[in-house]
């Protein structure tokens, strides 16, 4: 894994976690713009980093542990804003489990509210990965123009954005490991109590509509979080092609989070 940092002269630290099947390049333009106000740490996952093509994605826990240790060693574990997009939300949830960290504001953008199936048999795990992961590997991992147009349609993004953010050189092993490590893992939503939690969905396409299908059920369980739906945005559309709007939304929630943190202290 690799960490790209921008705006080190700024006081507040913002950590960005990009989605699966993409590279850090998808959010790089926004990261650089945000760096005018925040000190930005952008994580590039092993196996999905164009600058380290020889690496393989091992597991979500491995990526999260590396990030946690990096933040503790370099910044004392204090994070002002933690942002995750899509698969990055799963990394984000893992990071929130680390009690060594102090995270003020957390934003999960396009977060799936469904767990992977609990499959015990190694044989059936491989069968599941062959069909489930294999489908996404073909559509996203080796996408040509037609598949990118399809992805743009279902995510509510433009073709140009789909073409820019997809990383088509990751290995099958990296793709498989992304999902394999999550089979049987239950999401612990109680970690919402460790931060001021915000969940965003851009429902212009069909992807976030499906990802948010269990939203009302989650609300009913009483976990502390706020949710905002962007009807005019696609999956990841804010951080992707609407940089100014993204910054506005972040700046709107973070000061409130700081106020809540001060009251807790």
Where are the language model's segments positioned?
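Flexible "cap/lid" loop of the alpha/beta hydrolase fold
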Residues: 97, 103-135
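Conserved serine/cysteine hydrolase catalytic core
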Residues: 177-215
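Conserved HGGG/HGGXW glycine-rich cap/lid loop of the alpha/beta-hydrolase fold
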Residues: 4-52
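Conserved alpha/beta-hydrolase catalytic His-Asp/Glu region
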Residues: 118, 137-191
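Alpha/beta-hydrolase fold catalytic core
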Residues: 1-14, 36-38, 146, 255-265
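Active-site loop/oxyanion-hole signature of alpha/beta-hydrolase fold enzymes
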Residues: 42-83
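Gly/Ala-rich beta-loop-alpha elbow adjacent to hydrolase catalytic centers
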Residues: 83-92
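Catalytic histidine-centered segment of alpha/beta-hydrolase-like enzymes
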Residues: 233-242
């Amino acid at each position: 894994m690799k960490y790209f940092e921008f705006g080190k002269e700024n006081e507040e630290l913002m950590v960005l976690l990009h989605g699966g099947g993409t590279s850090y390049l998808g959010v790089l333009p926004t990261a650089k713009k945000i760096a005018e106000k925040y000190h930005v740490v952008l994580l590039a996952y092993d196996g999905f980093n164009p600058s380290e093509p020889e690496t393989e994605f091992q597991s979500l826990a491995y990526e999260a542990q590396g990030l946690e240790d990096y933040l503790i060693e370099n910044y004392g574990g204090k994070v002002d804003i933690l942002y995750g997009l899509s698969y990055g939300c799963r990394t984000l949830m893992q990071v929130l489990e680390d009690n060594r960290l102090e995270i003020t504001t957390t934003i999960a953008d396009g977060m799936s509210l469904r767990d992977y199936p609990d499959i015990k048999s190694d044989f059936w795990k491989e069968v599941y990965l062959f069909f489930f992961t294999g489908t996404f590997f073909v559509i996203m991992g080796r996408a040509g123009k037609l598949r990118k147009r399809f992805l743009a349609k279902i995510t509510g993004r433009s073709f140009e954005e789909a073409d820019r953010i997809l990383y088509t050189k990751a290995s099958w092993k990296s793709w498989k490991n992304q999902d394999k490590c999550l089979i049987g893992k239950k999401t612990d939503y109680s970690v919402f109590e460790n931060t001021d939690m915000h969940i965003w969905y851009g429902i212009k396409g069909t992807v976030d509509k499906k990802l948010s299908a269990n939203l009302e059920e989650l609300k009913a369980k009483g976990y502390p979080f706020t949710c905002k739906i962007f009807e005019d945005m696609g999956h990841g559309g804010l951080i992707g092609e609407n940089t100014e709007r993204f910054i506005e939304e972040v700046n709107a929630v973070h000061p409130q989070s700081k106020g809540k943190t001060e009251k807790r202290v």
